[in-house]
Amino acid sequence: MEADNGGPNSSHASKQRLRWTHELHERFVDAVAQLGGPDRATPKGVLRVMGVQGLTIYHVKSHLQKYRLAKYLPDSSSEGKKTDKKESGDMLSGLDGSSGMQITEALKLQMEVQKRLHEQLEVQRQLQLRIEAQGKYLKKIIEEQQRLSGVLGEPSAPVTGDSDPATPAPTSESPLQDKSGKDCGPDKSLSVDESLSSYREPLTPDSGCNIGSPDESTGEERLSKKPRLVRGAAGYTPDIVVGHPILESGLNTSYHQSDHVLAFDQPSTSLLGAEEQLDKVSGDNL
């Protein structure tokens, strides 16, 4: 310990400066600790415990005050700093942990969403494939049905064109015969005037009802117009009745002779008289 000599007076000697070395400070700290700490230690007690020569109560009091200030203020500031650091560290760690958890959760959600999207895409692809397969199957069925309908329709076409088996088959008569039959089929009962008028008509090859020669047709007309005697109230009068058409195409003389039968109720003399009378009337008309 070094003391400055300040002069002869005692007041100046009591206020001489003291340099606190490391050893002296250690002894001061031990004395304060023995006395119960900086709060309980008193300058007199510290001075007595230290027992250093030249050390005054003023020196101990001043150093004790500085020690107390240095003891409490740095401790409080350090504690405050430590608390702040601890809180800030906790906050940072909490933030880091929460942010890490949030990031992890976000990544998990993103992966889940991607997985679901992938599954949906796969389902859509499978559905598209099924739709295409179903369309091809339906198209094949339609083509098969059209082919079968075409095959069944081909043999059925001739069957529909045939005549109904229930209906009678058409006759083999030619249209010429039908026409000639219609044209040459007059009433079976003709009057004498109509038969006589037929003699006056010229016979030409173009006649539809006259196919043979003029001589043959004349003979046929004479044979066809045989008189038939009908018994009346006054006597017997000749009545000419034609049972068949006078002129028919395609028929021979023998047919007309066999068909026209004369019925007489009187003897042959009456028939001859009627023929003469008929020939006379025919000659007058010609």
From Swiss-Prot:
Gene3D superfamilies: Homeodomain-like. Residues 74-97, 152-227 are annotated as: Disordered. GO terms for cellular component: nucleus. A motif (LHEQLE) lies at residues 117-122. Residues 104-124 form a coiled coil. GO terms for molecular function: DNA binding; DNA-binding transcription factor activity. Residues 78-89 have a biased composition (Basic and acidic residues). Residues 12-72 form the HTH myb-type domain. GO terms for biological process: regulation of DNA-templated transcription. Residues 43-68 bind DNA. PROSITE patterns: HTH_MYB (PS51294). InterPro entries: Homeodomain-like_sf (IPR009057), Myb_CC_LHEQLE (IPR025756), Myb_dom (IPR017930), Myb_dom_plants (IPR006447), PHR1-like (IPR046955), SANT/Myb (IPR001005). Keywords: Coiled coil, DNA-binding, Nucleus, Transcription, Transcription regulation. Its main location: nucleus. The keyword ATP-binding does not apply. The keyword Aminoacyl-tRNA synthetase does not apply. It is found in: Nucleus. Belongs to the MYB-CC family. This is Myb family transcription factor PHL7. It comes from Arabidopsis thaliana.
